[in-house]
Amino acid sequence: MGAADGPVHLPTEYSHYEGAVARTFDLPLLILAQDNLMRRVVFDPNFGPYMGKFPENAGKQWLNGKDFKVAFGHWREAMGNRRDFFLGYCGAAAKTARQLRDFLEKQLDATVLDWQRDFKYSRSIIEEIEEARVRCSAGIFLFTKDDLMSKPDSGRQAAPRDNVVFEAGYFCAAKDKKRVLIIRELGAKMPADLGGDIYASLDDRRNLTVVKQSLRKFVSGF
């Protein structure tokens, strides 16, 4: 294409396709645009992340310049904030959650976003949950016997805390059921909409041995 100040280049359609996929999955993006490249779709400044620019004749020395370092710095910071799993649970089950987090981090080499340890007090919980959706690849939720039911069914004497159920459902919708593992304590009510094969049974919240194999299998999928 001709222009008064020189040619204007169109990026390959694969750049737009791959950028859209990355955006859909909330992956950190490092976008570098050549000068005179038409600024549209992925290469539009309003697409999202900071965009670096480079001249058509850029050599290796460009990597030492400000344009690259600033763009790379934004991307590296976003990557550093990524976690493998969000861990959701009721505060009353904090001891069990710490055991679970230690197993994930120390034995399975996974990175965990633990709301009690990692959330900022200056922000609302819903803001933190929304950010957790972006930062984490999947979610693990503890459904424990938190709230006694007025008319308990046989063997189901309590329900998980409402906010934990909400968070699990939110992650199922945002990430897909395959990216959510629910660890259900024996006797805790399981919401019908979240039933099926996405949970592991925990007989005793003080002993995680029975669910470790399910955790290994779940973690190995990411």
What residue ranges belong to the model's regions?
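Gly/Pro- and small hydrophobic-enriched strand-loop and loop-to-helix capping segments
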Residues: 23-53, 175-187
